[in-house]
Amino acid sequence: MEATREIYWNVTQVWVMYALLVPTAVAAGYGVYRHLSRWRRGQPAARFDRPRERVRLVLKHAVAQRRTARDAFAGLFHALISYGFVVLTVATTVVALDADFGTAIMRGRFYLYFQSLAVDVFGALVMVGVLMAAARRYLRRPRKLVHTDEAGLILAAVFLMCLQGFLVEGWRIAATDDPWGAWSPFGNLVARASRRLMSVEAMRTAHVSAWWFHLATSFAFVAWLPYTKMMHVLTAPLNIYAASLAPLGAALKRVDFEKTESFGVNTLGGFTWKD
């Protein structure tokens, strides 16, 4: 028997998910559009030359996260959350490809090593990263940190989505007696505890309720993301790629103080699109 799982096990009316995807995409798309509109109001600036150097900058600062790593504690939890999110996003994409396009990727060793083991481990690491970030923000409280309600809501939402994922996975493993369940270590912990406390029918009910709650939470988060500082997840690599490669101070122009009526930038259109 080849290792895999039924994608929509215990879930009916899947069309509702696709219906909810429409307002989610509209809300998120409008948020991205607002950012693009502001950028387009800026002055033109050539920032796509020397592509090799720009790719190196992206690898150094966006992928390797050299700047963030200067603070060891912050660098660690930032890496756990960001790399974990990449893995979870890839895993979600694989599920969508299998469900909607019949690609049959979720099979065999790939299903066991990546879709089960790696996804579980990285999901847990995201939760650890969130707890570390919360400890820094609310216990250590460094002076340089800007404290906002939004930051706390983002951390809570990310932690909740990961927790929901483990509950949904664990109840599915337990209720179906999944022979491959041990490959999902944290979901399997939920499954083992649930078998002692819940009937199969109770697990099925809990599973479908948590599945829809997880979907609603995830869609709401995606719709909200472009309106929060989490937008930097998408813009940071682009921002780094489009950084000025000119020597420091090369962009400064000589100012005639007698003839110039205004100094600096006093309108949005005075900046370049990159600024």
Region spans (language model):
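Membrane-embedded alpha-helical bundles of multi-pass integral membrane proteins
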Residues: 1-274
